[in-house]
Amino acid sequence: MNIFDHQIKNVDKGNVVAILGAQWGDEGKGKIIDMLSEYSDITCRFNGGANAGHTISVNDKKYALHLLPCGVLYDNNISVLGNGMVIHVKSLMEEIESVGGKLLDRLYLSNKAHILFDIHQIIDSIQETKKLKEGKQIGTTKRGIGPCYSTKASRIGIRLGTLKNFENFKNMYSKLIDHLMDLYNITEYDKEKELNLFYNYHLKLRDRIVDVISFMNTNLENNKKVLIEGANAAMLDIDFGTYPYVTSSCTTVGGVFSGLGIHHKKLNLVVGVVKSYLTRVGCGPFLTELNNDVGQYLREKGHEYGTTTKRPRRCGWLDIPMLLYVKCINSIDMINLTKLDVLSGLEEILLCVNFKNKKTGELLEKGCYPVEEEISEEYEPVYEKFSGWKEDISTCNEFDELPENAKKYILAIEKYLKTPIVWIGVGPNRKNMIVKKNFNLN
């Protein structure tokens, strides 16, 4: 389906579409972004860094992308990395090389994006080790994301635009590295080696570093079709997520505007990507978590191990109050429900439809969510039960071909969220996607 020219009633359409994760990440955003990139002129990243990850298959070849948007795999597509990102340039160059072709000719990097150095990764590891000893581990990817955003917020970070003038970059680099080595008592760090690498990056990237704000708005005025790719997901947002067990950037719709420099009236449509069950990596509250055989079944059948870290993901039942909270923040217009096939084989499927206070019995107010760890401990899930199905659904091409119990589960989710579920993932391959044409919103 061409997202820029869809025929769904009561849903806006236009030239700017954002695809955002609606849970704790790992929803399977890569597949839908890959499918929709075919219809876009420009694909963008606006937040995060190499702590995100997609594995995309094109013409039977797999590509692991952590910094580049999925549109890089299409020769007619321009790719943009926005100012809200933190970019480990060595990792970026390795990704560019792995994709091959004349990718650099259609890649644009914001001059306001911040550079993530190896020392940020060292600091990340130091901080996480210290927190582990204190029993306060966050469970970061140790990719240096938090420390880089920290230097940005402290106003001592270095932007990509600085790399265009290498002498100026060298001076700023030395001051930053010396400051961080002193602050974190780092005694050994090969500055000369890193500077030599950055001189090569300066030569290769100086013409690709641009004012992305001007670039984006000029292209929007020329009616270019833009697909915006969110990294991580809503419940990892630095403000709205389960703080402090979150990432360091704005992962919700507000990050689109602050991370690309386009204004809110330009965004026409938001697609929320929702896994048919729930997972999270690392620490933090998880009210529907399954520490049992069912949780292990979902982990193994769904291959729930981190793309970036390879860590096993925690698994649990789908959480409607969470999705209603995320919908409030992001104004989600459509949903892509992923990995429905993983639920095949379960005798019973539970859907969390509310939370009840353990002491008072009071139900959670619609649109609210207990993101604080101490508050989340006061609540317990209220479940609606559904019968499972045994059939292999990976060969289903239409909604009506799904088992009755699978259809009931999908329609219940749609009813609670009052948002059309347009795409349903029924298998790992690109073709394993049902496009649903009728919706249950009453």
UniProtKB/Swiss-Prot annotation:
Main subcellular location: cytoplasm
Cellular compartments per GO CC: cytoplasm
Entry cofactors: Mg(2+)
Family matches, as SUPFAM superfamilies: P-loop containing nucleoside triphosphate hydrolases
Keyword 4Fe-4S found: no
Sites where the protein binds substrate: T307, T308, T309, K310, R311, P312, R313
UniProt-annotated binding residues for IMP: D26, E27, G28, K29, N51, A52, G53, H54, T141, R155, N232, T247, R311
Binding site for Mg(2+): D26, G53
Subcellular compartments: Cytoplasm
Catalysed reactions listed for this entry: IMP + L-aspartate + GTP = N(6)-(1,2-dicarboxyethyl)-AMP + GDP + phosphate + 2 H(+)
EC code(s) of this entry: 6.3.4.4
InterPro entries recorded: Adenylosuccin_syn_GTP-bd, Adenylosuccin_syn_Lys_AS, Adenylosuccinate_synth_dom1, Adenylosuccinate_synth_dom2, Adenylosuccinate_synth_dom3, Adenylosuccinate_synthetase, P-loop_NTPase
Residues the record lists as binding GTP: 25-31, 53-55, 62, 307, 313, 339-341, 425-427
Pathway(s) it belongs to: Purine metabolism; AMP biosynthesis via de novo pathway; AMP from IMP: step 1/2
Cofactor binding mode and count: Binds 1 Mg(2+) ion per subunit.
Keywords: Cytoplasm, GTP-binding, Ligase, Magnesium, Metal-binding, Nucleotide-binding, Purine biosynthesis
Residues forming the catalytic site: D26 (proton acceptor), H54 (proton donor)
Pfam family of the protein (one): Adenylsucc_synt
UniProt GO MF annotations: adenylosuccinate synthase activity; GTP binding; magnesium ion binding
Additional remark text: Parasitic protozoa lack the de novo purine biosynthesis pathway and rely exclusively on the salvage pathway for their purine nucleotide requirements.
Assembly mode: Homodimer.
Function: Plays an important role in the salvage pathway for purine nucleotide biosynthesis. Catalyzes the first committed step in the biosynthesis of AMP from IMP.
UniProt family annotation: Belongs to the adenylosuccinate synthetase family.
PANTHER family per UniProt: ADENYLOSUCCINATE SYNTHETASE
Identification of the protein by name: Adenylosuccinate synthetase
